[in-house]
Every structure is written in structure tokens, then in C-alpha cells.
Amino acid sequence: MTREKNPLPITFYQKTALELAPSLLGCLLVKETDEGTASGYIVETEAYMGAGDRAAHSFNNRRTKRTEIMFAEAGRVYTYVMHTHTLLNVVAAEEDVPQAVLIRAIEPHEGQLLMEERRPGRSPREWTNGPGKLTKALGVTMNDYGRWITEQPLYIESGYTPEAISTGPRIGIDNSGEARDYPWRFWVTGNRYVSR
């Protein structure tokens, strides 16, 4: 039986990254591949606020081949590679306002056998409890760069409303001056799949 697909509308993403990051918590991230469909509930995100955010790739409106998609319309997929891992971001805000939300962790839902094959020798908790881990488990690649997050094969659906959301500093941005202390990481309080 094929699952019904009901992606969130593009208007959902037309807000600042600081507003979008917590609103994505509890939503279902879905990736369809030739091997099958895998999905998980988003449990951790980080907001990157663009021109004035030293931790953002688009700080000072820096435009490169890699960051160009951050200047596009809200709802575009921004993938990049860090330490051989693909990381998944969703572009926020309006065109030419280069903001994005990094998806840091998901709670596995569909396609858990696929995730296990893609993340062999690891416990279920370790399949998706980090930004490079979840993309491997779902099958997200650089080929997804620039897609609409509202269309197959990579999209987000509504899920559940978290009982509580925690905030704190973003991870791995020690060289970003005062921006390293901004409480722009959001996670579902107490969820075991949060990265740390």
C-alpha cells in the first residue's frame, strides 16, 4: 500500500529562520529513493540568520556557488558537504534574505530496515542523531540541492506538536565570535534522538 503524500505548503517556510526552526520540530521529513521510502520526525534544528550571523555561510551576504541557493525563495533545499557528510538545510525567509534552517536530528519512523542497511553496525539511536547521520540514513545526497522541499522525492509533512521545546547554543561553530553563543538551536525536550 502506498502512503498518502501531504507535503506542507510553501507558505509554511515563508518566515525567518528563527521562526521556522522551532516550527519544524515534530514535522515528518520524508525521502523517497529507488530502495524505498524512509522518514523521521524532526527533533533538532538550528537557525542561521544570514547576513548578520557570523556562523551562517551567507554572513555579510557572501554569495558563492555553494551558498547561492540560500538567496532563493523559501522552501528550497540547501545541501552541502562537511567532513564527507551531506548536511540538509531548508531555506527560509524571502528571496535575497539568505537564511536557512539546519536539520540536526530526526526520530526514525518509516523505512527503519533501510536506515539500518545504510548505517550498519550502529544502534537505532545512532542512525539519525546528528546532521550527517540522518542524511545517510534517509538517502539525502548533494543531488537534492536546490529542490523544493514541498515536492517528491524529499519533502516535509505535518507530524506532531512537541510537548516542550528546549533552546541552546548551536554546535560546531566555535570560530564565529559572539554568534557561537546565540540560543538558536532548538530541540524536542527529552527526545533520545537529539544529537547531544
UniProtKB/Swiss-Prot annotation:
Listed SUPFAM superfamilies: FMT C-terminal domain-like (SSF50486)
GO MF annotation list: alkylbase DNA N-glycosylase activity; DNA binding
InterPro entries: Formyl_transferase-like_C_sf (IPR011034), MPG (IPR003180), MPG_sf (IPR036995)
Cross-referenced NCBIfam families: 3mg, PRK00802.1-2
Keyword Transmembrane: no
Membrane-spanning parts: none
Keywords: DNA damage, DNA repair, Hydrolase
Lineage: Bacteria, Bacillati, Bacillota, Bacilli, Bacillales
EC category name: hydrolase
Origin species: Bacillus subtilis (strain 168)
GO biological process: base-excision repair
Keyword DNA repair on entry: yes
Family that this chain belongs to: Belongs to the DNA glycosylase MPG family.
Name of the protein this chain belongs to: Putative 3-methyladenine DNA glycosylase
